[in-house]
Amino acid sequence: MTANQTPQTVHYATVTWDQLHRDARLLAATLMQKHGPFRGIVAITRGGLIPAAILGREMGCRLIESVSVISYAGEEGTQHEPKVVKPPVAAGDGEGFLIVDDLVDSGVTARIVRELLPKAVFACLYAKPEGKPFTDHYVTEVAQDTWVLFPWDTAPLFVPPLVRSEGE
C-alpha cells in the first residue's frame, strides 16, 4: 500500500443455519409459484450444495446434479480464470432444471453455468449488485463489499463473559 492509498474496509455478514433455512424455504415458495415443478436441480459446488438439498426437499425434487467451476484460489478469494472441472451431464441444456447457488457475487461462475445450461432457471439465496443480472431469483441483496460468512464456513466458539466473579 502506498502513502496515497487507504486500506479497503471489508464488511462481513454472518448467515446462521436458521436464516439460511428460512431464506431457502422462501426461495422455494417463490420458485414453485412462478415455475411449477422442476425435473431436477443443478447445485453449483460447493456453496450451492446445501441450498440445493433444502430446495429439493421443499419442492419434492429428487434429481440433484452438480456442476463445479473453479474461479477462486484459496480462502482469500483470489479470482482466477474460471474452469469447469465437473459438468452437469444429467441436465442437458438445462430445460426443466433449476440452477442453485448460495451467492452470486461477480457473476463469473453464474455466467459460465448459464452458458452450459441456457434453458435452466437460475436462483440463489443472496446476490451482490454485480451478480444480480445473472440470476433469475434471489432472496436478499448484499452489498458488493460484504463478505458473506455461511454456516459451513464458520464454527461456534466459546466466548468468556466480560465480567468474572471475584472468586475466580
UniProtKB/Swiss-Prot annotation:
GO molecular function, one term: magnesium ion binding
UniProt cofactor(s): Mg(2+)
Reaction equation(s) it catalyzes: GMP + diphosphate = guanine + 5-phospho-alpha-D-ribose 1-diphosphate; XMP + diphosphate = xanthine + 5-phospho-alpha-D-ribose 1-diphosphate; IMP + diphosphate = hypoxanthine + 5-phospho-alpha-D-ribose 1-diphosphate
Binding of 5-phospho-alpha-D-ribose 1-diphosphate, residues: 46-47, 101-109
Bilayer topology term: Peripheral membrane protein
Positions of guanine binding: 105
Record GO cellular component, one term: cytosol
Residues that, per the record, bind GMP: 105-109, 147-148
EC annotation from Swiss-Prot or TrEMBL: 2.4.2.-, 2.4.2.22
Primary site of residence: membrane
Gene3D superfamilies linked to this entry: 3.40.50.2020
GO biological process: GMP salvage; IMP salvage; purine ribonucleoside salvage; XMP salvage
Residue numbers binding Mg(2+): 102
Short name of any one Pfam family annotated for the protein: Pribosyltran
Pathway of action: Purine metabolism; GMP biosynthesis via salvage pathway; GMP from guanine: step 1/1; Purine metabolism; XMP biosynthesis via salvage pathway; XMP from xanthine: step 1/1
Binding positions (xanthine): 105, 148
InterPro entries cross-referenced by the UniProt entry: PRibTrfase_dom, PRTase-like, Xanthine_Guanine_PRibTrfase
Family that this chain belongs to: Belongs to the purine/pyrimidine phosphoribosyltransferase family. XGPT subfamily.
Function summary: Purine salvage pathway enzyme that catalyzes the transfer of the ribosyl-5-phosphate group from 5-phospho-alpha-D-ribose 1-diphosphate (PRPP) to the N9 position of the 6-oxopurines guanine and xanthine to form the corresponding ribonucleotides GMP (guanosine 5'-monophosphate) and XMP (xanthosine 5'-monophosphate), with the release of PPi. To a lesser extent, also acts on hypoxanthine.
Subunit relationships: Homotetramer.
PANTHER family: XANTHINE PHOSPHORIBOSYLTRANSFERASE, XANTHINE-GUANINE PHOSPHORIBOSYLTRANSFERASE
Protein name (database record): Xanthine-guanine phosphoribosyltransferase
Gene: gpt
